[in-house]
Structure formats: C-alpha cells, structure tokens
Amino acid sequence: NNNAIITSSGNLTGKAGARIDYSTKSTIEDLVNKGYVLVNDGFPAGAVYDNDDGTTQIFSVILKHGTVPVTPENPGKPGEPINPNDPDGPKWPDGTDEKSVKRTGTQTIHYEGAGDKTPSDDVQTFDFTKKMVVDKVTGKIIDSGEWNVTSHTFGYKDTPVIDGYHADKRNAGGTVVTPDDLNKTVTVTYKSN
C-alpha cells in the first residue's frame, strides 16, 4: 500500500557470521490472515549477520493488499468478516450482497377474461449480473463493476387461441427491462365472440 511499512522486526543484533535467530513465517501468516498477499519474502533462510558495523542489514518482505471478487456465485455478506481467520478485521461492506450483483428482470404476460379457460400467466426472466472487487485489507469496494448488459428486450409470445373468445392482442411481450426497472406486465384481455 504505497510502500508503507506494515510491521518491523525491530533491531536485531548479533555477532558477525552468526545465524540471525528470526523467522518471518508467523508475521507473514498473521498478515495473510488479515487479507494481505505475499509478494516476496526477502529474508533468506539461514541468514547471518554481516561483518560491516557501518552498514545496517535490511531484509524486506513485500506484501500487497489482497482482493476478492464479488459475484452472484460468491456474494459478500455485509457485516460479516471478509477474512475468516480475522474475525475482528474488515467486514463485508453494504452493497456486496447477492442483490447488488444479480438482479432478475421479469416479463409477465397476464391473461384475463376467458373464465376458467383463461391461460395462466406467462413469465419470462432475465438475470442482470456484475462482478465487483473488494479490498480484503480495507474492506472497501475498489471496483463496483458494470452490469453484463444495460437493458434486455423480451421476445413476443403468440396469444393462445381459445374457442368462443377473441383477444385484444395477437401477440404480447417485447418489453424492456433494466437493472433499475426490473418488472414489466402486459395484459391480454379476452372477450367472448
């Protein structure tokens, strides 16, 4: 994160040529549990103190913020921890639940007027989906994503023929839904001949 120092081992001292009694393992594991991703562990196994008192040995361990995709198959759970091994860490933000990445549009063709011969409603659906990205360290949405399409036009359906009745539409449908305007109804009315 802008090359910020996350943590440090502090100053370690020892005799020249002696093995440095330190391990990055537990610190890295702790940071990974908090959402970081290891880029490079610059502290080599078996590192030893040098024999130059005028130079400070510096070993850099580089990590970056981990991210997690939010999809209809893998939605966030607002208020719950993003990182299961860090229950006190960042929580899923509002706007990452399934309804935020998947919205289902419907076209309902509603038939009426033919008594018990009236057909059942014809319902068609279309799913608008998108992928978001959340920073596992900060818990912020870093990419809110775009919907797979901005609108969907449903097809037309031929109106069922019922003996003794005529309908006000030969076919019905063709409605347009968007992620913000999801449900459309078209009514077909039958009248007796």
Where are these regions (language model features)?
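Residue-level detector of beta-strand face positions
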Residues: 30, 108-110, 132, 158-159
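Intrinsically disordered, low-complexity segments
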Residues: 6-7, 142, 190
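Conserved "repeat-terminator" motif of extracellular CCP/Sushi domains
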Residues: 1, 49-112, 169-193
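Short, ordered, surface-exposed loop/turn motifs in non-cytosolic proteins
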Residues: 2-11, 115-136
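Residues that cap or initiate secondary-structure elements
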Residues: 67-69, 115, 132-134, 153, ...
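Acidic/polar residues at beta-strand termini and the immediately following turn/coil
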Residues: 1-2, 21, 113, 133-141, ...
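Surface-exposed interfaces of beta-sheet-rich extracellular modules
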Residues: 20-54, 69-77, 144-177
